[in-house]
């Protein structure tokens, strides 16, 4: 089975051109399934799999505390894997027939209000190179709605500050161009002029915009650690994740009159239904405002 997984991952890289993060997610899901089947059935040949094995795996995952969202992702990964094996003639039947994807509760994105955004953006110690970097990253995230992977992947050639925009490669290798406001541009220029040269190291000749203290490009995990520190310093009691500023970016645009299609393009969503979730957030926030300020609410 492990050899078949390697073949599948190679197919995803070469034929479908999926991102490294997506490939890792597929691999993680499939390895989890194989580890379960090794214990449950001593699996070596996928042709021995039956529908009951998939049902048993789903039950096992839920017993381990996996969410409905995680189980749904496992099922999607297995469907793709088995479809590949059948198409390649390495599997004679589909054990996923009549397997239903678990229904997921549609959670609304967590959004910061403007006061909390201001606290978060002003909580970095800008007297140090790393603090200037952190402030610039926070400003860029809120100003552009970038995903964290897109942020840490930014290269110097992606910046067009004199023209007021940056470019990025998002999901599905789709390029998009995003305007950059004056505040974010000013903060970013300060970081590039005063802090980044101090973080660069001769042995690491890379052109990533945001560098760690070793002079290397930041990782998503590295950014997550930085964000936790900034969130703690800000005193904001709400949970803050790497996606919080992206959610806030989208919601605040819609609240101030931006049309849904423009927000979809800025976020890089392939399907507008993904963007529509933010309209539900704005409606709930309007309801809260009404209850708070209308005399007969």
UniProtKB/Swiss-Prot annotation:
A Gene Ontology molecular function term for this protein is: DNA binding
* Origin superkingdom: Bacteria
Q: Where is the active site?
A: 147, 171, 243, 246, 269, 278 (o-(3'-phospho-dna)-tyrosine intermediate)
Asked if the keyword Manganese belongs to this entry, the reply reads no
- Which Gene3D superfamilies does the entry link to? 1.10.150.130, Intergrase catalytic core (1.10.443.10)
Please name the Pfam families in this protein's record: Phage_int_SAM_1, Phage_integrase
**Where is this protein chiefly located?**
cytoplasm
Q: Which residues form the Core-binding (CB) domain?
A: 1-86
The record's keywords, sorted A to Z, are: Cell cycle, Cell division, Chromosome partition, Cytoplasm, DNA integration, DNA recombination, DNA-binding
Record domain Tyr recombinase: where: 107-291
Q: Does the keyword Cell wall biogenesis/degradation apply?
A: no
Protein's job: Site-specific tyrosine recombinase, which acts by catalyzing the cutting and rejoining of the recombining DNA molecules. The XerC-XerD complex is essential to convert dimers of the bacterial chromosome into monomers to permit their segregation at cell division. It also contributes to the segregational stability of plasmids.
Q: Into which family does the record put it?
A: Belongs to the 'phage' integrase family. XerD subfamily.
Descriptive protein name: Tyrosine recombinase XerD
State the organism of origin.
Listeria monocytogenes serotype 4b (strain F2365)
Lineage, top ranks: Bacteria, Bacillati, Bacillota, Bacilli, Bacillales
> Which gene name belongs to this protein?
xerD
